[in-house]
Structure formats: C-alpha cells, structure tokens
A protein has these predicted regions:
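Internal helix-loop-helix
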Residues: 48-120, 160-167, 178
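Flexible, small-/acidic-enriched active-site or ligand-binding loops
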Residues: 138, 190-215
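Glycine-rich phosphate/pyrophosphate-binding beta-alpha loops
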Residues: 132-133, 157-162, 205
Length: 215
C-alpha cells in the first residue's frame, strides 16, 4: 500500500530541491567554506524554491499552505549536502518567521516578509547574550519607552546570519524578572544606535555568518 502522505506534489517538490542542491550547492560547498562566505544570489535562489514559504500567506510571498512532510524533505535533502554552515546562514530568516508572522503588525509584515521570502534581504532572531547564553529567563538586554519609541540597551551574540541581515526580531526585558518580562521587537539594521561585529575563527561552519549585536 502506498504511503498516503507520499503524494505526487511532495515527490515533485523533493526532486526539485534535490536537483537544485546537486547543481548549485554541492560543487561549491568546500570553496565557500574555505572562503568563509557565499554569493548573495544563493539566498535568492534558495528562496525561489519556496522552502521558507510554508505557512506564509501568498500576499507576503509565501506558499499559502503548510506541509510538514515537505518541510521534513527539505531538511533531509539539505542535510545530505554537508553544507550546514551555508544553510544555517541562509535559513536564519526561518527562525524569525514564527514571531514575525504571528505577532507583528500588518505594516511590519508587508515591509519585511516579501523581502525575506524573495531572499533580497536576510533576517535573524536575537536571543542569545554574552555570559547568559540562550537562557531567556535571565535575559539582560532591556527596553524602555521614550515618547512613542522604544529604546533597546544591551547586546546579543552568536547570532546566525547577523552580519548580512537587514531585519531582526530581538528579545528584550520590558518588565519583571523571568520569562514573563520579555518582549520582542522588530529592528532594522539601519536603526540609529545599532551596530554589529563579525565572529571569526570559529571551529567550523565557516560559511555561516555569525555576529554580535550591540544596542
């Protein structure tokens, strides 16, 4: 009996992803890793496949549907390339899409999502902090309101995709200690007072763009 979830659409999608990886990624993996970077157009080519568009409305450039089996297939096929650093960097937008699509205003979504879906711009999630790691309950970055604006003060580190990202979702403390006092902020890379620096000489995943962010 045929697996009812192994549909023709899923098979075609998997084959498309595999063909792309075999022709566009595998031949260059070692070269890009040694160089510590990859061509910007790879972001756009990967995004053209739709691999980050699951669960995102078509009006934002997404696929307009979700499929957990197709998501799994993407992960499996990407894993076969041994290009973990590359896909960590290209895929850094993926870990910010959840909070962005669920919590952001329509104005922010219309601004950022089409850019992220097309690969024209990158995005990252900023949670991990120097000295505290990813223990969200102990987050030290703070935000306070001045007039109609929020001002962030602190830093984040080991942020995947942080040097090339144009958009960030940043966690900051706005209330009491612990998990209950954390808010998320949409931050653009050209925001006054925001700077970043690259983390170099890593043990591996050299293609992965990794940064420390300062507010």
């Amino acid at each position: 009996m045929r697996n009812p979830y192994d549909t023709d659409d899923r098979k075609s999608f998997r084959e498309m992803v595999t063909k792309f990886l075999e022709t566009e990624i595998w031949p260059h993996v070692d070269e890009w890793d040694e160089a510590g970077q990859y061509p910007q157009e790879i972001n756009e080519k990967v995004c053209e496949l739709g691999v980050f568009g699951f669960g995102i409305d078509e009006k934002y450039g997404g696929l307009g549907f979700d499929d957990q089996f197709m998501r799994k297939d993407v992960s499996v096929e990407m894993g076969r390339t041994s290009a973990g650093g590359l896909f960590a960097s290209v895929g850094s937008r993926n870990i910010m899409l959840g909070p962005l699509t669920e919590l952001a205003s329509e104005e922010i979504k219309m601004k950022a999502l089409p850019d992220l879906m097309s690969g024209r711009k990158g995005g990252s999630l900023g949670i991990t902090e120097p000295g505290g790691g990813s223990d969200v309950a102990q987050m030290k970055t703070v935000a306070h309101k001045e007039g109609d604006e929020w001002v962030l003060n602190g830093s984040k580190t080991f942020i995947t995709g942080g040097m090339q990202a144009s958009y960030f979702v940043i966690g900051a403390r706005t209330g009491k200690e612990g998990l209950g006092g954390i808010s998320l902020f949409f931050v653009e890379a050209d925001t006054p007072g925001f700077t970043r620096s690259a983390i170099e000489k890593k043990m591996g995943w050299w293609t992965s763009d990794t940064a420390t962010l300062y507010f």
